[in-house]
A protein has these predicted regions:
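Carbohydrate-binding/catalytic loop surfaces
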Residues: 176-178
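Catalytic-core segments of hydrolase enzymes
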Residues: 1-91, 163-165
Length: 178
């Protein structure tokens, strides 16, 4: 059926309110808002100031991944902080049987006697976050280990990432998707 939700102030306050539907598995695919807003979908902990919030995009056609949360936050913070490749990304498979002798179970060995590592393809913002985690590791190595910025902080890491990001010249930044 069609539900109507009434929201009342318990104190004399004005402002906006936001509603989210539960995740998959708790509602049917037919359950929708009549006038949905695809923005302000970033949730905890990514909607707070400190974390580096990562969106995902398709690196083959430079489109934002449809399930990537969009900003800004309810409190007006500009999020996501950065977008990284997150669609059909190939990488090593976890828990797929690398034997104790260093060979892939049932897979033989790779070139020059190295173990063939089972590969898999994944999609999502977790994949994009892994890209950014690698970039952060490189920044920490450059800044702290190599001595270029020994007082590097979360804020400076975020600033380096944002300043170094490739931007589409047809778009204005910041924006709610990228």
């Amino acid at each position: 059926g069609i539900w109507k939700i009434r929201v009342f102030n318990t104190q004399y306050l004005t402002g906006l309110f936001h509603l989210w539907l539960p995740s998959q598995g708790l509602i049917s695919d037919e359950t929708v808002f009549l006038t949905p807003n695809p923005y302000t979908t970033i949730t905890m902990p990514g909607n707070t100031a400190s974390p580096i919030t990562v969106g995902a995009y398709n690196h083959l056609n430079n489109s934002i991944y449809i399930h990537s949360s969009r900003g800004y936050t309810v409190g007006g913070l500009i999020k996501p902080d950065i977008a990284a490749p997150g669609v059909n990304i190939s990488g090593p498979a976890v828990g797929r049987g690398i034997g104790s002798a260093g060979t892939a179970a049932g897979r033989g060995t790779g070139s020059a006697g190295t173990a063939a590592v089972p590969m898999t393809t994944r999609t999502g913002t977790s994949v994009a976050a892994a890209h950014v985690a690698g970039a952060v590791a490189n920044l920490l190595s450059w800044g702290i280990v190599e001595g270029h910025n020994i007082t590097m902080s979360e804020a400076s890491i975020k600033a380096y990432l944002i300043r170094g990001a490739r931007r589409n010249p047809a778009l204005s930044y910041p924006n709610r998707e990228w």
